[in-house]
Amino acid sequence: MAEHIELKRVVMVKAIVTEAFKENLIKELDRAVKNIEMQASQMDMQSKNYLEDLKKKGLMQKAAAFKHQLDDERTRQAAAKSDLMMKIEEAKRLEIGTEFVQGPLEGPVKVGIGDNLYKKVGGAEIIVKDGIVQEIRGAE
C-alpha cells in the first residue's frame, strides 16, 4: 500500500501592483485590441471578395448563410474588443501596492497518510512583484 501520492492543485498567482506592472498590463491589453482590429480588417477584406464571388455564381443562399456567419463573428469580435477596452480602463485605475489576481497555475503536492487533504490541496497563492516571487501562502 502506498504511503504518499502526488496530486495536482491550483495555485493562484497574484501580482503586487507597481507602475511597471500597470504599464505592462495596459500594453498587453492594448496589443490584444490591435490584434482584434487587424483580424477584423482582414476578415472584412477577404469576406467581401468571397461574397462577391458567391453572388456572381448565383449562390444566393450560400451568400446569405455566409453573411450571417460573418455578422455573428463581427458581433463576437466587437464584444471581445469592448471587454478588453473595459479591462484597460480597470488597469488604469489599479492602485499601487494592491494585489491583482493574474490567474491560476497548476502545481504538484505530495499527500500522505495522516495529512489533512483540504489543507494540502486548497488555497495556495504565489505573490509576485514585477515578476519576482515575494511570498508563498497556504503551501503546506
Predicted regions and their residues:
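Short, charge-rich amphipathic alpha-helices with coiled-coil/heptad character
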Residues: 1-26
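Extended alpha-helical coiled-coil "stalk/arm" regions
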Residues: 36-62
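Hydrophobic alpha-helical segments used as single-pass signal-anchor/transmembrane membrane anchors
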Residues: 127-128
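Amphipathic alpha-helical coiled-coil segments
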Residues: 22, 29-36, 40-43, 70, ...
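Short clusters of small/polar residues that mark proteolytic maturation junctions
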Residues: 137-138
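Coiled-coil termination/hinge junctions
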Residues: 74-124
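Long, charge-rich amphipathic alpha-helical coiled-coil "stalk/tentacle" segments
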Residues: 52, 56-86
